[in-house]
């Protein structure tokens, strides 16, 4: 009897531990390699293994010390398109990271951030074990994935508490610095590369000039979208306040990757929310949106009618 009780207690403890240490993410990695089909350097089976590796790495790693219930996992999509394989095991392409969050008291899921990475290159061989050490650059692919994971944590945590993502800003910044010094892909990690590359994304998020943007995310989501069902007027006020904040940030740092990527993700949502506003609020929203997101001026024109 004592043995049975002990076994039951051990099983219960194991189950409890599994629940408590549930991983943070529900990442879905989609790998498109259609442009590589037929290449002697590309084996379809290795592509399947690569996609599995990326999903497992992102979903099974422990990224925080916090407790996540299954329904609290952060939903992310990583859409990767491989366009070149200059040598066996070497791949080049682009990636799109999409971070989502549920809106309280609704069935609506909002996109927190969309980031397009045009300098996605790495080495992968199914027979080679990839190692990750956050304090020592090891391999390109796990470092890219860890960087993305921390970017996702920044936006998710900032949306639930003011500057809640700060610990992950520092982690992503450290990863980027290590990669910048060691990676062969300078276009992705170096300050002299593309102005929307990984260096500039985390530079923005780490800059004091962007603190109002990060603080505003809490107001936009937690005090705005999350109360839309009960108080849509408050939601519109918070959204307009955040747009004003973004305008002030953009004056200090024009054409930044954070602001541009924000509008890539939010234009539909912003228009939908502000279409219910009063005429004066609509005019203010249109003036800001058409100025900060000029390629979609015609799209926002409905607010000016």
Q: Residues of each region from the PLM?
A:
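Start-of-domain marker
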Residues: 24-92, 103-105
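Soluble non-cytosolic domains of exported or imported proteins
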Residues: 41-49, 139-144, 257
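Flexible, glycine-rich surface segments
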Residues: 161-255
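Acidic/His-rich structured neighborhood in mature extracellular/periplasmic domains
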Residues: 87-203
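Sec-exported extracytoplasmic/periplasmic mature domains
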Residues: 55-63, 150, 154-157, 271, ...
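A cross-kingdom marker for long, charged
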Residues: 30, 215-305
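Bacterial Sec-dependent N-terminal signal peptides
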Residues: 1-26
């Amino acid at each position: 009897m004592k043995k049975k009780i002990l076994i039951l207690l051990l099983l219960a403890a194991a189950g409890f531990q599994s629940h408590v240490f549930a991983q943070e993410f529900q990442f879905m990695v989609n790998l498109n390699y259609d442009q590589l089909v037929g290449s002697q350097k590309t084996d379809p089976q290795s592509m399947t293994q690569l996609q599995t590796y990326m999903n497992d790495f992102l979903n099974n790693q422990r990224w925080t010390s916090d407790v996540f219930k299954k329904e609290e996992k952060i939903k992310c999509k990583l859409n990767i398109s491989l366009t070149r394989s200059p040598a066996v095991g070497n791949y080049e392409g682009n990636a799109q990271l999409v971070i989502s969050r549920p809106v309280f008291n609704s069935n609506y899921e909002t996109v927190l951030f969309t980031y397009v990475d045009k300098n996605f290159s790495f080495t992968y061989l199914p027979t080679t074990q990839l190692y990750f050490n956050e304090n020592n650059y090891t391999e390109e692919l796990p470092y890219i994935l860890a960087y993305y994971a921390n970017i996702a944590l920044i936006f998710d945590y900032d949306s639930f508490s003011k500057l809640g993502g700060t610990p992950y800003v520092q982690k992503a910044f450290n990863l980027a610095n290590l990669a910048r010094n060691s990676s062969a892909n300078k276009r992705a990690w170096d300050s002299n590369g593309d102005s929307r590359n990984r260096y500039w994304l985390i530079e923005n998020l780490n800059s004091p000039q962007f603190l109002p943007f990060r603080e505003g995310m809490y107001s936009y989501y937690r005090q705005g979208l999350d109360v839309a069902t009960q108080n849509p007027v408050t939601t519109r006020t918070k959204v307009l306040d955040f747009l004003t904040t973004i305008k002030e940030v953009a004056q200090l740092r024009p054409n930044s990757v954070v602001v541009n990527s924000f509008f890539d993700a939010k234009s539909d949502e912003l228009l939908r929310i502000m279409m219910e506003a009063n005429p004066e609020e609509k005019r203010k929203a249109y003036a800001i949106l058409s100025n900060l997101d000029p390629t979609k001026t015609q799209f926002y024109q409905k607010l000016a009618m």
